[in-house]
Regions:
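Charged, low-complexity intrinsically disordered terminal segments
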Residues: 1-122, 126-265
């Protein structure tokens, strides 16, 4: 891959299969770190395929940090807590609700001002060298793996100096007061051998997927071919990365001076 000094490289991921391939490729090729930040991480087929790749990375010695918003974790934080039993996997929940049972919805209504402050960032960074940013969460509907519903969205595979800024944004959220270690959030008890159980289940799910039509689509993916040929056609340009800092969530009133809406109207 040819690099350009001081410029960043961008490759747009408009195809849903390519978007999955890019994330899977980063997970299986990471050597030191994986930083993963999402609003939604579904425990469906695509989510489990990526979880298996991430768990394999941790087994290789890669330090994995996962930051996920709490809004869609009702009853599902136990699987994340199982993964966090791995010595190389740290998981934090963004703005977690106190109630983890059916009182959760009541808390959402009573404390809407706080509970409504969510994290929509979507970041996947490998080795502080390659990153994916964009609109897709983790789930079948984002990667063309559902029959009844699939979303159209856009991500960018990025390399170069901008990855440092993307990594800094992850660190800001990871270290913020809104991010709580999952061990302090989930009250459900897990033991070390459950990690072996979930590893076996994820391995079995991936092995069965290798005979599926979806796996054939992955093999035929345009990005898969480019990765194998080591010929990803990055567009190189000067770039700046803008993001909302987590401190914005502590403000009671929006800063209208930085909003474009009033000026347009």
């Amino acid at each position: 891959m040819k690099t350009q000094q001081k410029q960043s490289g961008f490759y747009l991921l408009s195809d849903n299969i390519d978007a999955f391939v890019a994330r899977f490729a980063l997970a299986i090729s990471a050597k030191k770190t994986l930083d993963i930040q999402y609003y939604i991480i579904h425990n469906d087929a695509s989510g489990q395929y990526l979880a298996y790749a991430i768990l394999q990375a941790a087994d290789r010695g890669v330090h994995v940090r996962i930051l996920v918003d709490d809004i869609n974790l009702s009853g599902r934080d136990i699987r994340l807590k199982m993964l966090s039993q791995h010595d190389n996997i740290d998981i934090r929940i963004f703005n977690p609700l106190s109630n983890r049972d059916w009182f959760r919805n009541l808390e959402m209504i009573v404390h809407l001002d706080r509970a409504g402050r969510r994290m929509h960032n979507k970041v996947f960074v490998a080795d502080n060298a390659v990153a994916i940013i964009g609109g897709r969460n983790i789930g079948d509907e984002y990667f063309d793996n559902r029959n009844e519903l699939n979303f159209v969205d856009l991500d960018a595979l990025t390399v170069g100096p901008i990855v440092d800024d993307i990594g800094s944004s992850f660190d800001d959220y990871w270290n913020s007061c809104w991010a709580t270690p999952i061990e302090q959030v989930s009250r459900r008890h897990v033991v070390k051998n459950q990690l072996s159980t979930i590893r076996a289940k994820l391995r079995d799910r991936w092995q069965r997927a290798r005979n599926s039509q979806y796996f054939k689509s992955i093999q035929r993916s345009d990005l898969t071919k480019k990765i194998i040929a080591r010929e990803i056609p990055f567009v190189w340009a000067n770039a700046r990365f803008f993001y909302d800092r987590p401190e914005k969530l502590t403000r009671n009133k929006p800063e209208r001076t930085v909003h474009l809406g009033p000026h347009i109207m």
